[in-house]
Regions:
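Alpha-helical scaffold domains
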Residues: 1-122
Length: 122
C-alpha cells in the first residue's frame, strides 16, 4: 500500500496511524520491519519508517527515532528531509531536551530544512 500509488499524504496517514499503531502493539516484531524500511530504496518506505512514531509522544522509542534520523541525514530527497524535521518537531513537544541535545550533536549532518522543522518548538 505504501509503495503502490503512493504520495506523501497517503503515506503519512498510513505511517502515523496504521504502522504507528502496529509498532506500539507489536514493537518486537515490527522493529525489524522498520529497520528494513529505513534503508529501503523506496523513498516512501523510508519516510514511513521515520514517521511511524509520529503520534507516540511519551511512548516514542527515542533511540530508534534518532538512529533513523542519523541514518537518513545525508538524503537529498525533499520528502525525507521534511519527514526528519517533522518527526523531531513532534517529539520535541514531549521531550524538548532530548531533541535539542540531538540537534546539538547531529544537527550539522542534517539538512537546513530538517533542522528548521525540528527546532520550531524549541
Amino acid at each position: 500500500m505504501i509503495v503502490e500509488g503512493a504520495w506523501w499524504d497517503f503515506v503519512d496517514d498510513i505511517a502515523a496511524n496504521l504502522v504507528g499503531a502496529l509498532l506500539l502493539d507489536y514493537r518486537e516484531s515490527m522493529r525489524p520491519v522498520m529497520e528494513a524500511w529505513i534503508d529501503d530504496p523506496d523513498r516512501w518506505r523510508r519516510r514511513a519508517a521515520i514517521l511511524s512514531q509520529l503520534r507516540h509522544k511519551e511512548r516514542t522509542d527515542a533511540e530508534m527515532l534518532f538512529d533513523f534520523c542519523r541514518r537518513r541525514a545525508h538524503e537529498t530527497e525533499f520528502f525525507i528531509r521534511k519527514a526528519i524535521g517533522w518527526a523531531l518537531r513532534e517529539y520535541s513537544k514531549t521531550d524538548p531536551e532530548a531533541v535539542a541535545a540531538f540537534l546539538r550533536a547531529e544537527g550539522d549532518a542534517l539538512s537546513g530544512l530538517s533542522r528548521r522543522e525540528a527546532a520550531k518548538h524549541l
